[in-house]
Regions:
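N-terminal phosphate-binding caps/lids of nucleotide- and nucleic-acid-binding domains
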Residues: 1-180
């Protein structure tokens, strides 16, 4: 399951939570490094990536212009990890109680780059763009439950039952799903 929560169109707050495999404590700082991944150890790993997550530059770019917290725990670990960085600088890494999976919280995007902040569109436009990404993700992975909330209001909820028609119904509506 993946839950995406935003406030103010995602310009002040984004929280993405999954119930996946989590990250090892030593891998968490790598998540904000450019061109780094903990998912690939050998060349043959490229053939077998079966997990989702931020790729390549994405989280590094986000971490450079915002405050980021990563809370993660693997099923085999007794305790999770809370990693905090602000504008690309590591603030802390500490033990934390949390469920299996990963939560990434992004706040105050572009606070340190006001010129970039000016290029953001209206909150409703930015929020609609986030919803569109969630819908596309839900349609591409009908076996994963996807939930999206904007300013506390549920906008999307798919069952994750593996049925394309269920995902289409949740993302695009009854009429579209009925036409399938």
């Amino acid at each position: 399951a993946v839950t995406v929560e935003i406030k103010d169109g995602g310009t002040s707050f984004v929280r993405i939570t999954d119930n996946g495999c989590g990250m090892a404590r030593e891998d968490v700082p790598k998540a904000i490094l450019r061109h780094a991944t903990s998912k690939i150890k050998t060349g043959s790993d490229l053939e077998a990536i079966g997990t989702l997550g931020f790729r390549g530059e994405a989280l590094a770019a986000i971490a450079a212009v915002s405050a980021v917290r990563i809370l993660t725990k693997r099923p085999e670990d007794e305790i999770g990890t809370l990693f905090v960085c602000r504008f690309g600088e590591v603030i802390s890494t500490e033990d934390a109680g949390c469920p299996d999976g990963t939560t990434i919280i992004v706040e105050n995007i572009f606070e340190n780059t006001p010129a970039r902040r000016k290029f953001l569109k209206k909150n409703t436009t930015e929020g609609s763009a986030v919803l569109a990404v969630c819908e596309k993700f839900a349609l591409s992975r009908p076996n994963i439950s996807v939930r999206f909330l904007s300013d506390g209001n549920p906008k999307l909820q798919t069952p994750g039952d593996g049925k394309m028609q269920s995902a289409v119904y949740a993302a695009l509506g009854r009429e579209f799903a009925s036409a399938m």
